[in-house]
Amino acid sequence: MQELDSSNDEWVKELEGENEESKFTGRRLVKKSISVPELVDEVEEDLDDFTEPADDFNDKVGKKRQRKKKDESGLEKTKKNKKQNSEEVQEMWDSITNNTNSQYGDKVVVKPPKKKDEDAEEIKKLFSLRKKKSKCDKTSMEIGMQVEQVMANLEIAVEDDVICNREGKPAINKLMKLPLLNETLSKKPLQGEFLDHGVLNLLKNWLEPLPDGSLPNINIRSAVLMILNDFRIDLDQDSRREQLIKSGLGKVIMFLSKSDEETTPNRRLANDIINKWGRIIYNKSTRYDNMFTQEELDEQRQILLRRQTKTAPKVSGTRARDFNTDIDLYELGTWTGRARAKIPTTMSMDFKIRPPSKVDINQEEEPCSKWQMEKRHKNKQQKNIRKGGMQALKLSVDGRTMLKYL
């Protein structure tokens, strides 16, 4: 028994000595290698050699793979630590700046609602709530019934204004119905239907003066004239032409165009309406050449011929001989005793009497005097000197001869 104990003690000492040597050798290898980030003891490798291999491929290549896995696990740990540190720093910074939109941490991020999306949704709702227009067209009977109702309301307004005017009250019924008149008669598709129901008679009643002789409100007059100017009345048709003549609307518009109480814009508008209707009714063209009749053109031609063949006023013989002074036109013509301006007329330049000249050709020239001859001679000399170039004269000591610039 003592021998066994001693043998066991020796075996344990040998193992301890081998372990110490392996530790020293392992540490030396680790110090020499720079690529490995951490110190790895070879004791673990020796222990692995003693253990039974779990897989068939437990060779040197397998050991290298295991080392790589261990290195990768160490790098992952460092990355996790860095992430944790960065998250903590970010949380600290967010708590200081009161930033709720942090990407780290367990806080729930609440995004503010977008205004543009809300506005777009509200606009869509508004359009969706609108009622769609009925695609079914109204029949002619329904349109006729509506036109008759409008005409009846407008006629009642005219009758009420007449009654109010006779009683001395303000006539404001037509003024209240004016928006209805503008709205209905401004619609182009309904104008033909209104003409068939006699709207021209209604408009004449709206424009004509009240029983006391006063004109309707200026807003009513201007609105009705504007409607008539834009109204489609096909006067080429005989039925429409007769309808316009029988309604008496033209007489009322003519009265407004010549009335002093009417404003100038309304008078111009009334004149335009009359000219437009009159040319169509009386078949007058708008060309300037066709606006005059043949008789008027003949009269204009005769006037031009008279102006061309008009002779000069007759002059007495005694006055014609003495032509030294200007002739007074008032003395030649018939003097009425009124000094007024006359319209200038063209004068034909066909003269029969030539005025006598003031110069006598037969008169002999008198002999010139000496001073006249000298003066002429000096003038000639000066002209000759000016024509030629300037020459400098020689100076004398006495100063008798001087330079002359002529």
UniProtKB/Swiss-Prot annotation:
Residues annotated as domain TFIIS N-terminal: 201-284
Biased segments, Basic and acidic residues type: 10-24, 69-78
Subcellular location: Nucleus
Domain of life: Eukaryota
Matches recorded under Pfam families: Med26 (PF08711)
Region described as Disordered: spans on this chain: 1-28, 41-89
GO CC, alphabetical: nucleus
Keywords: Nucleus, Transcription, Transcription regulation
GO process annotations (BP): brassinosteroid mediated signaling pathway; regulation of DNA-templated transcription elongation
Phenotype upon loss of function: No visible phenotype under normal growth conditions.
Biased composition, class Acidic residues, residue ranges: 41-56
PROSITE patterns per the UniProt record, alphabetical: TFIIS_N (PS51319)
Protein function: Transcription factor involved in RNA polymerase II (RNAPII) transcription regulation. Involved in transcription elongation. May function at post-recruitment and elongation steps of transcription.
Family the entry assigns: Belongs to the IWS1 family.
PANTHER family attached to this UniProt entry: PROTEIN IWS1 HOMOLOG 1, PROTEIN IWS1 HOMOLOG 2
Name of the protein: Protein IWS1 homolog 2
Organism from which the protein derives: Arabidopsis thaliana (Mouse-ear cress)
Lineage, opening ranks: Eukaryota, Viridiplantae, Streptophyta, Embryophyta, Tracheophyta
